[in-house]
């Protein structure tokens, strides 16, 4: 979160006191600087994948399967991480299944909850009234379903698709957590099922990083006696082939970042090339988005250093100069900047030029202008926070959030992510939609801002920092820190409800775009769930290694 941590020089030309953040260094050394893609292995995977894809496509479109079986097949494809190969076929099937759905009395809780989750994930608004038959006259869950671990687990995952006004799903969420925790502690679950439940309680499907969750599910599915070997084989091959591609991309990014050598000129900043690529891969992991991933990663890296400049190094006067330079977006503005800022400013202009050239080759450069404007907006808001800090000003919570929804990077990340999508998906209308400040982008930004405020609060206040949302709420409402945290988490949950509702049909823009906003929101849940995993990358180190280094045994 950006804010000036220091005042200006005390007198004359004396060097100002700078309250450095002392961020942890990069974990990776030269670990990702070299990688040679095994083209023979990549081709071998690819050839078998193409054969298996046709077999699975035939499964998806084949008739004669009961609705519950078809929904389960779609669920397995999604959880194995291979549904992106069959998007058209799956959407056609779901449209038919939703139109024909009947609340069959024979459907158990697992099946009803699975229908609910899959339909809502794809924009179909199934009513939560479908769960009424599992409650007694006192509106409590019947005992027969309370001890059904598969049913409870399915309902638990379904509750994450709730929207505003669905109090039943709030109750169901709390109830299923309590039941699942109790069942895990009991003696009746197999070790495999217990492991699956514990993972779900730690990370839900809906809010998880799709590629990481696919890898987890593959390990569970492999132990399932009813598994389909064709699906399992496809999932393993697909994960490993895509991992090779991602590793090669990461190597290119890592070398580019090392050659840029910006950190040596701004050593106060977080060195997070690998983590930014991890972030970008969550936004879109599919192989056709390699150019987009590279562009998004580079922009995120420059934003990260800019954030740290405002947050943990620059004086107020220096920051004003930098804000003005970014608004001008012209190399001549560099002359007015201190030396360390010149390096950052030059890198910023060059990165956007690189990204624009790469996208121009594919006829998609028109989005770059929107990303630049979003970057300018963030820097203006960073300066507002720097002024607040200099003046010791604690904003009202509403005033804080108005500015924080900009510094949360929701607009910039969404715009920069859209730049890397196909031209017929990320149209000029899509970028204009972002300019309307849509509820979904605001909700995504609120999630990121508020969860970061909670998780990084103590550390930031220890070194001196502008008042965060937590501080503003505490002062305005006269409540304790813990009480404020409870209220902020209520806001986070409401933001998730808004995201879910914005993804229900009819949607404002293509679902292919909205899923990217959802993915950007998921990053906050994964990276900031227990601590600020971006500032402290050891928290997500295992995720990075799992995603980019460790293949799935064949």
UniProtKB/Swiss-Prot annotation:
Its EC number is 4.2.3.204. Mg(2+) 3 binds at residues 452, 456, 460. Pathway: Secondary metabolite biosynthesis; terpenoid biosynthesis. One of its GO terms (molecular function) is terpene synthase activity. SUPFAM superfamilies: Terpenoid cyclases/Protein prenyltransferases, Terpenoid synthases. The keyword RNA-binding does not apply. Coiled coil: none annotated. The keyword Acyltransferase does not apply. A motif (DDXXD motif) lies at residues 326-330. Keywords: Lyase, Magnesium, Metal-binding. GO terms for biological process: diterpenoid biosynthetic process; sesquiterpenoid biosynthetic process. Mg(2+) 2 binds at residues 307, 311. CDD domains: Terpene_cyclase_plant_C1. Its cofactor is Mg(2+). It comes from the Eukaryota. It catalyses: (2E,6E)-farnesyl diphosphate + H2O = valerianol + diphosphate. Binds 3 Mg(2+) ions per subunit. It is an enzyme of class 4 (lyase). It holds the Pfam family Terpene_synth_C. Terpene synthase that catalyzes the biosynthesis of the terpene valerianol, which is a volatile compound of floral scent. The Asp-Asp-Xaa-Xaa-Asp/Glu (DDXXD/E) motif is important for the catalytic activity, presumably through binding to Mg(2+). Belongs to the terpene synthase family. This is Valerianol synthase TPS1C. It comes from Camellia hiemalis (Camellia).
């Amino acid at each position: 979160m950006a804010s000036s941590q220091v005042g200006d020089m005390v007198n004359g030309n004396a060097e100002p006191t700078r309250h450095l953040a002392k961020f942890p260094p990069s974990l990776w050394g030269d670990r990702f600087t070299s990688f040679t893609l095994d083209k023979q292995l990549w081709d071998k995977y690819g050839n078998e994948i193409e054969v298996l894809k046709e077999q699975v496509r035939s499964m998806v479109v084949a008739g004669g399967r009961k609705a519950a079986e078809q929904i389960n097949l779609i669920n397995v494809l999604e959880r194995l991480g291979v549904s992106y190969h069959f998007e058209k076929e799956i959407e056609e099937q779901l449209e038919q299944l939703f139109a024909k759905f009947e609340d069959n009395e024979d459907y158990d809780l697992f099946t009803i909850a699975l229908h609910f989750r899959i339909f809502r994930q794809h924009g179909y608004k199934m009513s939560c009234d479908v769960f009424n038959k599992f409650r007694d006259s006192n509106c409590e869950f019947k005992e027969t379903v309370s001890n059904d671990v598969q049913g409870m687990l399915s309902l638990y995952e379904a509750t994450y698709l709730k929207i505003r006004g669905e109090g039943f799903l709030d109750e169901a969420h709390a109830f299923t957590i309590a039941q699942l925790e109790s069942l895990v502690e009991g003696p009746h679950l197999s070790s495999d099922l217990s492991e699956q439940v514990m993972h779900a309680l730690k990370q839900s499907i809906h809010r998880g990083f799709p590629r990481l969750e696919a890898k987890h599910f593959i390990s569970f599915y492999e132990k399932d006696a009813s598994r389909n070997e064709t699906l399992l084989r496809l999932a393993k091959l697909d994960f490993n082939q895509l991992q090779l591609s991602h590793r090669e991309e990461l190597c290119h990014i890592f070398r580019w970042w090392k050659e840029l050598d910006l950190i040596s000129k701004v050593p106060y900043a977080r060195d997070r090339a690998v983590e930014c690529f991890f972030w970008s891969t969550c936004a879109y992991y599919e192989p056709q988005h390699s150019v987009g991933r590279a562009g998004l990663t580079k922009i995120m890296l420059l934003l990260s250093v800019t954030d740290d400049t405002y947050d943990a190094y620059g004086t107020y006067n220096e920051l004003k100069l930098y804000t003005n330079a970014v608004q001008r977006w012209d190399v001549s503005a560099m002359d007015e900047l201190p030396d360390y800022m010149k390096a950052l400013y030059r890198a910023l202009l060059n990165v956007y030029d690189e990204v624009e050239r790469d996208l121009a080759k594919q006829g998609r450069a028109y989005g770059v202008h929107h990303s630049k404007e979003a970057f300018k907006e963030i820097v203006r808001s960073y300066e507002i926070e720097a002024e607040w800090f200099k003046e010791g000003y604690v904003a009202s919570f509403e005033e804080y959030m108005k500015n924080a929804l900009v510094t949360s990077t929701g607009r910039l990340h969404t715009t920069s992510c859209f730049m890397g999508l196909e031209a017929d998906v990320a149209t000029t209308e899509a970028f204009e939609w972002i300019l309307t400040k849509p509820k979904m982008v605001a909700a995504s930004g609120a999630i990121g801002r508020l969860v970061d405020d909670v998780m990084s609060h103590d550390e930031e206040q220890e070194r001196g920092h502008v008042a965060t949302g937590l501080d503003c709420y505490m002062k305005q409402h006269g409540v304790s820190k813990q009480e404020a945290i409870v209220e902020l988490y209520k806001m986070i949950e409401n933001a998730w409800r808004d995201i879910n509702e914005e993804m229900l049909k009819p949607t404002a823009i293509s679902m292919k775009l909205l899923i990217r906003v959802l993915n950007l929101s998921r990053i906050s849940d994964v990276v900031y769930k227990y601590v600020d995993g971006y500032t402290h990358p050891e928290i997500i180190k295992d995720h990075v290694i799992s995603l980019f280094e460790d293949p799935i045994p064949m």
